[in-house]
């Protein structure tokens, strides 16, 4: 398992004296592997924080995730396949917050994913070339939020990640 906790204080010198500080206390992050065998792994993670900024703007979040991913399954034709099931429970409340209400908001999100790839090798007289075409099918039966106005970038490094936009809520 892995457990991290603490508190953080930020100072923004651009703000007026009353709104200059942001307090994050406490915050925690706990993760553990619940099951790991020859078929795959089941992982649990919970993280939360209380954030106070602009004198009276309070936001409290608790996020729980439960992920199951299979080990790679090799077919006779050379395909490497795996699938994953991802559940996320988001609990948020805010006080004087523009994004969240003062009552507890709770969401259950999930994604089902199937990945497949086919490693290919080409031998020449002096070189060996490798290429691996990949495809990922995802189903999200939950409501999806619109992040098109956010400044997020999808690159070749994160295109196959489950959280490729790097969004925490």
Where are these regions (language model features)?
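Outer-membrane beta-barrel proteins and related beta-barrel translocases across Gram-negative bacteria
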Residues: 1-169
């Amino acid at each position: 398992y892995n457990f991290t906790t603490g508190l953080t204080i930020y100072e923004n010198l651009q703000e007026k004296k009353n709104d200059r500080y942001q307090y994050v206390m406490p915050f925690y992050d706990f993760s553990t592997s619940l099951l790991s065998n020859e078929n795959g792994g089941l992982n649990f993670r919970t993280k939360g924080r209380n954030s106070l900024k602009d004198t009276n703007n309070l936001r409290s979040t608790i996020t729980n995730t439960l992920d199951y991913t299979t080990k790679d399954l090799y077919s006779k034709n050379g395909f490497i396949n795996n699938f994953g099931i991802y559940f996320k429970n988001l609990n948020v409340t805010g006080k004087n917050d523009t994004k969240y209400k003062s009552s507890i908001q709770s969401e259950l999100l999930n994604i089902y994913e199937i990945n497949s790839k086919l490693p290919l090798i080409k031998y020449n007289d002096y070189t060996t070339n490798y290429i691996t075409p990949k495809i990922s099918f995802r189903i999200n039966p939950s409501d999806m939020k619109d992040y098109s106005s956010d400044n997020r970038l999808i690159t070749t490094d994160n295109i196959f990640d489950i959280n490729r936009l790097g969004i925490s809520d």
